[in-house]
Amino acid sequence: GAGEGEIARFVASWLQRMGVEVVWDEPVPGRPSVVGIVRGSGGGRSLLLNAHMDTVGVTGMQRPHEPLIEGTRLYGRGAYDMKAGLAAIMLAAAEAKKMTLRGDVILTAVADEEYASIGTQSIIKRWRADAAIVTEPTALQLCVAHKGFLWFEIVTRGTAAHGSRPDLGRDAIVKMGHVLLGLERLNQELQARPPHYLLGHGSLHASLIQGGQELSSYPERCTLQVERRTIPGETPEQVEAEVRDLLEQLHAADATFEATVRTTLQRAPFEVVPDAEIVQTVRRHATLDDAPEIVGNAAWMDAALLTAAGIPTVVFGPGGAGAHAVVEWSDLQQLKKCSAVLVNTLREFCA
């Protein structure tokens, strides 16, 4: 798309007006992230606040970039995923500027979470913190785990020939049919394994398939894109081995079966223990009548990258609905509550 330049400039300008130190981080041209720093007096713990600025497409939406408020709901593309969470950390950073803290507050408004996460990946190379809060939408619940994923490309090989010459042709699409049946069996095996206590089971599905050139020819190539969703404890090596084993079994049963597999993208799952200090600190300040629930999320978030970098992380953000949907909205009351919880959390954690 157009990149994050315009929204990044807005975030940077707003933070500067609030007196927050701003660093511009642009590892890829046109995909900037903004870091806002409220420096403490020294000797305290630092807290990183993370939200992404990018959104998905707007096909089918009516006036997606014109904000509409009805009651406590703000409608528009990105309102839920995740401009509300971004607004919450901006407000919290502005409040932090008014406090006397020993530790630093580091706001990271990042690019590209929806695809390759180049924003957060660049941030963790340059910045460290004692804990982090990602304000993806959780309806003010505490998310301590989410799934990871791997994307595979499987290619089966055939022999091109005229459709009238079955003695010469070998059908790559038919060969891929055996792969699809094998993947279905593998997915059934995944459902029979012990589930994660918050996330359930891992899963896989065939996402895209392409093969053949014309009706009167045997296809020499068929390509399948597969997504495998992983749970904590499942490693990329284990997942890749399962797919390779399937292809080897198919070759053992049919010497004419030829296939290759490669991983095109992988992201680890995320998990933090519920009694981690950052989780419990947020929980204390988020407790009104009842303590917020400890939950998991099936989607992937940048929390996994922060945790892998050694930063204990929890996901806590305002509610709403419609991520990646035609109708998207965020709850403005929950946005205010989220920001207040962040302010009280950083006041304690960075004291």
Predicted regions and their residues:
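Acidic/His- and Gly-rich active-site-bordering loop/insert found
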Residues: G1-R77, K98-L101, R284
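Metal-dependent amide/peptide-bond hydrolase catalytic core
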Residues: A2, V23-V28, E153-A351
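Structural motif
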Residues: R45-L48, T72-R73, V105-I106, D130-I133, ...
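Acidic-glycine-rich active-site phosphate/pyrophosphate-binding loop
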Residues: D54-E70, V144-V155, T281, V314
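Glycine/serine-rich anion-binding loops at beta->alpha junctions
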Residues: T72-A88, H162
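Acidic/histidine-rich catalytic neighborhood of metal-dependent amide-processing enzymes
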Residues: M82-W151, C350-A351
